[in-house]
Amino acid sequence: MARDATKLEATVAKLKKHWAESAPRDMRAAFSADPGRFGRYSLCLDDLLFDWSKCRVNDETMALLKELAVAADVEGRRAAMFAGEHINNTEDRVVLHVALRDTSSKEVLVDGHNVLPDVKHVLDRMAAFADGIRSGALKGATGRKITDIVNIGIGGSDLGPVMATLALAPYHDGPRAHFVSNIDGAHIADTLSPLDPASTLIIVASKTFTTIETMTNAQTARKWVADTLGEAAVGAHFAAVSTALDKVAAFGIPEDRVFGFWDWVGGRYSVWSAIGLPVMIAVGPDNFRKFLAGAHAMDVHFRDAPLEKNLPVMLGLIGYWHRAICGYGSRAIIPYDQRLSRLPAYLQQLDMESNGKSVTLDGKPVSGPTGPVVWGEPGTNGQHAFFQLLHQGTDTIPLEFIVAAKGHEPTLDHQHEMLMANCLAQSEALMKGRTLDEARAQLQAKNLPASQVERIAPHRVFSGNRPSLTLIHDMLDPYALGRLIALYEHRVFVEAQIFGINAFDQWGVELGKELATELLPVVSGKEGASGRDASTQGLVAHLHARRKA
């Protein structure tokens, strides 16, 4: 069936009425009255558990949300994506990052062409190159083994590889990995200063080889190599992830060190492609393939499972409920895993660049809110930074906890137990809160004077009823990481279909880039600022004055 706008509008109205009149208000009471609540509002895929029972939903909520998914034709749009239809309508492109990790299909067609042999060819070339670097068969220009790799990229060419490389630190047995993204010269200067060009490989990741930040940093790195080792050494110390073979050749990188990908792979969905080359070099081709296999397992589940048993669908529906019905404008991602420290930033781009839209697929203004602000930090660090606001602030911010049952350090298992206890405690505290009577009783137990009890007790009240969901897997390994990232990719897709927007373009990135190009000669003093707004003129004048001071 196609998207049913009339039914969708009616279901949204029913959900809003339900939220106002009959959604759970007291989560303590909801759990007391329903011992089976956890079982009904949780799902498993193998060892991966998704629990949303602490969210303010009941059976009526879930029935209406499923009705919403049907009206939005989530299943039809899902099928269209997997079938290679041009669902990115503003750029007339198919959306097939799922093909990058497809190990079970015989063919995946893009405009009649089976792309799986192409995907396999690039993956095999990546593996051969990675093995060569890791083993020392591919050496630097002076014959030294490569000990460090520096990936230069930005956005999807940086966030995914950084996140995955940090997450898979226990599997690193290759060269050390470093990442440069910011055009701020401090970033590349600080990265290169402790390294030796003779044992460093630099990967330049830019599909067009024109991205300003990436190419500026790449030229700086090229000069660093050439000034030390000579111009002829450049080719032995660079590789590229790009489709612009002419520009790559002009830069001095041989074609056998260039790895391409396709326009049906969006930047924020590209870590599975050649963009993941630094990850593969760090952890090895076998572990990278396990990373792909985990994502593929989630793809198959998302494609085949019925709506009510489908983890990405249910995660997306809860996300929509929180954003569009409950009115929560923010979403906190809190992985209780230090190695997932960059996951919030990765999901921030994935979600906000995909669903930060204000017009529908047909170019009309949306009728309600779309994607939330996504942010976060690892636990337990966040508890000592911003959890005060999450517990007692005036805004309700849903939290998404992620934790593993087992850590990688058996001799430090007691610390992992403390980590898990903190994660579950925060989830419980947000839900239960603490009443005024409970706060008084706690203070009275300390034998404080009655006047002091009455003065302090209100400050120790927690409202509770603050929603959170929890994801638990056995251990953060390559397979589990791939599965987790694919879960969030498909969740974003589900929410976009209900919002009625295109999750696969990012026109909001363009205007600032265009104006930066115009302003560069103004900031550098080659052109005047006349014709620009008074604020920009004033800022330019101040910068000029301070640079001369």
From Swiss-Prot:
Residue numbers annotated as active site: E353, H384, K513
A GO term for molecular function: monosaccharide binding
Subcellular location: Cytoplasm
Catalyses which reaction(s): alpha-D-glucose 6-phosphate = beta-D-fructose 6-phosphate
Transmembrane parts of this sequence: none
Family that this chain belongs to: Belongs to the GPI family.
Name of this protein: Glucose-6-phosphate isomerase
Species classification: Bacteria, Pseudomonadati, Pseudomonadota, Alphaproteobacteria, Hyphomicrobiales
Protein's gene: pgi
